[in-house]
């Protein structure tokens, strides 16, 4: 191993040891009961709640997927995606957070999202709980796979080891850490990792701009790439066998492609995903007091805006400094790694790599924990064995963690996977399956249990149908699957609710008490 790689490895090992230390510290508290293991006993402060929510939300996608899109095809796709995410983050904290925290307590102290949905409609047969748990298992397993792809790409790029070997190493570390501490450990470490992520993003960007000779020089270096710096146009890399061609050290681009209103709407639709994102919604439920949500929202927005802007600019700066270094869409996602290793001393590059590891851990532990809770708490205790003890539920949850990890590993075996693509599908799945359900559950008293079931099935099903059947038709049908699936889910909720018997007086009275803050 080269001396530089060894120094990077040492820094990353120290970082991982610190993360594991947090897990061990919180393990005893996490094991007390299921509320502490899955929701931290509703004890999160505003800073931890905000930054752990955003760190677990963004994942390695923030440091690899988003910069990779900017490097590969320019500003438009990355900018409009980030704009949608920023707006979605703000609205979610402003509109959903307080009502969801209050309602989750009123709904028999629900500690998971499926449990909240089921209790909201006073279910006896737990159909909503079962369906929502199944969708969570499916989409979070896909989401976890994207994190393992990030680990594999990171370690194989750094150390020249086989992708699969490095992906398995990353999976083992994340699994062990998640087994240790549960939600409290996850949230505490996510807070630390959110700090690491934003620091390394800003540091690498600043150094990259300085090495390029300033922002003006960055833009000068890429201005001749057609559509690269436009908001309503997009660059089109000329490829052969998926590899971008270059002439005399200059990357080849075709004619600028139009980026019209449909494309903008498609990318802005990413913001809709927040309303159905369990790892974010759980932080709303877990904050210790309602009056701390306003401060948490401000913290979250500052972090999100800085991080997204820095991630996009890293992709642009990377193309300006190293225009032909990364020649496929998959390789482009290594631009942050490439910049860090090229511009930073080995020890600082190790810290930057720890930033990617931080992003990956902060997301994958959330995904694994929520998926395991969906099976153990919601399916097993909620449906199959209602008298199961907390100890049984936590034991089963820990058994399910390696099972879910193994399935995610199978999905992540392809080293040519594009992180952005994997994340976008899982994001659409959660947004369309649960987003409309969350909004209508919190703000429409007339919504019925049948409407909730119809909304979940139609939204989740339409994501698959649009992605696999309709989207390949191209043209207007090429829009991001989240938008049509979200709309379809909302329509089904309204129509089916109005066609079925109104909720009982007990359910409606509970809704009014929550609305009034009683």
Name each region found by the language model.
Residues 1-518:
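Membrane-embedded helix-loop-helix hairpins and adjacent transmembrane boundary segments
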